[in-house]
Amino acid sequence: MIRCGLACERCRWILPLLLLSAIAFDIIALAGRGWLQSSDHGQTSSLWWKCSQEGGGSGSYEEGCQSLMEYAWGRAAAAMLFCGFIILVICFILSFFALCGPQMLVFLRVIGGLLALAAVFQIISLVIYPVKYTQTFTLHANPAVTYIYNWAYGFGWAATIILIGCAFFFCCLPNYEDDLLGNAKPRYFYTSA
């Protein structure tokens, strides 16, 4: 006999692991140097620095780099991404309490709402950065050089997409409270004799 069912017990471990991976992606995005890179490798930028020397730089005034924190949009982008990261860490900690005890399932929708708020903060940051960077430094002045938003910027978007998905699941999980607690009979989508 073939039985196919839905096991909600896995959600107790999968969702915190997804949040942990989003935390790792956000750390990479916050600390990574590869937010923007020119095709001739003459410029590398991170969330914090713009380095215009051959091969880029690690980010310091001694290497001829310019701090993006001198601009209001640079501070806003960094603050929004960092606020989203802090909310994500808080939600990660709360998810253990909410998914371990039967009395704490009330917090699941709160966690989902906080994750949605963190996703909004990160989306704003990830949109402000390329728009204002392009306007401030006129990247289209030299048509021979192409600018590519690179791996660290992509990790920021990956963390944001995970946040959106986890927010949806945390908001929907209280509807399946009996399944999470193991009180419901298994529902089979298909049975064959």
Swiss-Prot record:
GO cellular component terms given for this protein: cell-cell junction; desmosome; Golgi apparatus; mitochondrion; plasma membrane
Subcellular location, record wording: Cell junction, Desmosome; Cell membrane; Cytoplasm
Alphabetized Pfam families for the sequence: PMP22_Claudin
InterPro entries in UniProt: P53_induced, PMP22/EMP/MP20/Claudin
Keywords from the UniProt entry: Apoptosis, Cell adhesion, Cell junction, Cell membrane, Cytoplasm, Disease variant, Membrane, Palmoplantar keratoderma, Transmembrane, Transmembrane helix
TM region(s), chain numbering: 12-32, 79-99, 110-130, 151-171
Cross-referenced Gene3D superfamilies: 1.20.140.150
GO biological process, alphabetically ordered: amelogenesis; cell-cell adhesion; desmosome organization; heterotypic cell-cell adhesion; intrinsic apoptotic signaling pathway by p53 class mediator; mammary gland duct morphogenesis; Notch signaling pathway; positive regulation of neutrophil chemotaxis
Main location: other
Topological category with respect to the lipid bilayer: Multi-pass membrane protein
Function: Component of intercellular desmosome junctions. Plays a role in stratified epithelial integrity and cell-cell adhesion by promoting desmosome assembly. Thereby plays a role in barrier function of the skin against infection. Plays a role in mammary epithelial tissue homeostasis and remodeling during and after pregnancy, potentially via its involvement in desmosome cell-cell junctions. Required for tooth enamel development via facilitating desmosome-mediated ameloblast adhesion to the stratum intermedium during the transitional stage of amelogenesis.
Record's subunit section: (Microbial infection) Interacts with S.typhimurium sipA and sctB1/sipC.
Disease in which the protein is involved: Erythrokeratodermia variabilis et progressiva 7: A form of erythrokeratodermia variabilis et progressiva, a genodermatosis characterized by the coexistence of two independent skin lesions: transient erythema and hyperkeratosis that is usually localized but occasionally occurs in its generalized form. Clinical presentation varies significantly within a family and from one family to another. Palmoplantar keratoderma is present in around 50% of cases. Olmsted syndrome 2: A form of Olmsted syndrome, a rare congenital disorder characterized by bilateral mutilating palmoplantar keratoderma and periorificial keratotic plaques with severe itching at all lesions. Diffuse alopecia, constriction of digits, and onychodystrophy have also been reported. Infections and squamous cell carcinomas can arise on the keratotic areas. The digital constriction may progress to autoamputation of fingers and toes. OLMS2 is an autosomal dominant form with onset in the first months of life or in early childhood.
The family this protein is said to belong to: Belongs to the TMEM47 family.
UniProt name for this protein: p53 apoptosis effector related to PMP-22
Organism, as annotated: Homo sapiens
